[in-house]
A protein has these predicted regions:
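N-terminal pre-domain segments of enzymes
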Residues: 23-69
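C-terminal catalytic histidine-bearing segment of alpha/beta-hydrolase fold enzymes
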Residues: 336-379
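N-terminal cap/lid segment of alpha/beta-hydrolase-fold proteins
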Residues: 76-128
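Short beta-strand/loop motif that positions the catalytic acidic residue
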Residues: 309, 316-318
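Mobile cap/lid helix-loop segments that gate and shape the active-site cleft of serine hydrolases
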Residues: 206, 210-213, 228-229, 266-307, ...
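Alpha/beta-hydrolase fold nucleophile elbow
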Residues: 238-249
């Protein structure tokens, strides 16, 4: 009898898990009236949807140009014409005699100081050129400290190490130079306050609202910051310009996707728990408000961001237990990107992998891909 009950429980669990990841079950459903409305307005013109029958390089140039415009990056560039970022060093320390971690502040636009950590392996010959890993974080107010292994206290350390979140520190311990920057609107150092809780007591949403009325988006601000940090970093003779890697989890993954699509200096891109279609097939919006781009569906979708990254190295990683994303929508998007890479005879440079857990980094998947990518670049 006990054995029968046990087998019944196992069967029910299997059924539950099967249904949870069923390709036939929609991630979210809406009432028909709402569903019809969303389907009608969200279809979009998808003007820059990838088309295998057009000139690929010309498509990339035009799609990239328009993307820069609609996110507001062009406006930031125009508004800041003549502005020169400045950098100050805040603190330098040697960690366990293994690497040097230096905190900098970069003024990316007037009055905006974006902190970032630079991690450099210790006791390396200065003439040796290193890969560079750039790793913006997502919704973590201590994000740059988390990624850099600069923990606030023991609780913070245990939390981050428990989910493999010290990605910039992992990189430097593997002999790379790494940068862990604050993500504007998400790190406590560069938040936009939400007085009176008008925007739901969410600084990232407050950032979005202030950006929208100014003709820009948080995504544009964040891409701009990453590009200014890259401009500075690539003046360092120790960095191999052909081995620039970018990764981030969640909102940091979204930023990785957009930066990689817009900036060809990124040679290896690894967006984690973030790279999926803008909406589900029923109209559900997957990403945070602060990632919203007005009119993006008239431009295209994440599939086309992947097309702008092609044929550079791209690994898309998701957690199978991540409740923020839909397996069917992730795979629909990544299958379309695989087809683009196949058209470019670059199938070996793109991969999609599922981690066994939830919304986190998967170093066991990421580092082998990075090592293989760097080996391919160095040939």
């Amino acid at each position: 009898m006990n054995m029968h009950k046990t087998l019944t429980c196992v069967y029910l669990v299997c059924i539950f898990v099967s249904k949870s990841f069923s390709q036939d079950s929609p991630f979210v459903t809406y009432p028909k009236k709402t569903s019809d409305y969303l389907k009608r307005i969200q279809t979009g013109k998808a003007k820059y949807k990838y088309n295998p029958n057009i000139n690929f390089k010309e498509w990339q140039i035009e799609a990239r140009k328009e993307l820069s415009k609609i996110i507001g990056l062009d406006k930031i560039t125009q508004d800041l014409e003549g502005f020169k970022p400045s950098i100050i060093q805040i603190k330098e320390e040697t960690i366990d005699d293994k690497y040097i971690r230096t905190l900098y502040h970069i003024e990316t636009e007037p009055g905006i100081q974006v902190p970032f950590y630079l991690l450099v392996p210790k006791n390396r010959q200065l003439r040796e050129k290193h890969p560079l890993l750039l790793s913006p974080h997502g919704h973590d107010v201590d994000g740059l400290h988390s990624y850099a292994g600069a923990y606030i206290n023991k609780s913070h350390r245990d939390k981050i190490l428990g989910r493999d979140g010290n990605i910039a520190e992992q990189a430097v311990l593997k002999g790379m130079i790494s940068i862990a920057p604050a993500t504007r609107g998400l790190a406590k150092e560069v938040l936009i306050p939400d007085p009176k809780g008008r925007h739901g007591n969410r600084p990232c949403r407050a950032q979005l609202m202030h950006c929208l009325i100014s003709g820009r988006t948080p995504t544009a601000e964040r891409v701009w910051d990453m590009q200014k940090i890259l401009d500075w970093a690539l003046k360092d003779s120790r960095i191999n310009r052909e081995m620039i890697i970018m990764t981030g989890n969640s909102g940091g993954g979204v930023l990785t996707a957009y930066t990689s699509a817009l900036d060809e200096r990124i040679k290896v891109s690894l967006p984690s728990c973030s790279f999926t279609s803008i909406t589900s097939n029923t109209g559900y919006i997957f990403h945070c408000d602060c990632c919203a781009i007005p009119g993006i569906k008239d431009w295209g979708d994440f599939r086309d961001l992947g097309g702008l990254i092609a044929p550079r190295r791209l690994l898309i990683v998701h957690g199978i237990k991540d409740g923020l994303h839909s397996k069917i929508d992730v795979e629909r998007t990544t299958d379309a990107i695989k087809a683009i890479y196949s058209d470019r005879n670059a199938s070996d440079k793109m991969s999609m992998r599922w981690g066994k857990s939830g919304h986190k980094f998967y170093p066991d998947i990421m580092w082998p891909f990075i090592q293989k990518a760097l080996a391919g670049i160095s040939k």
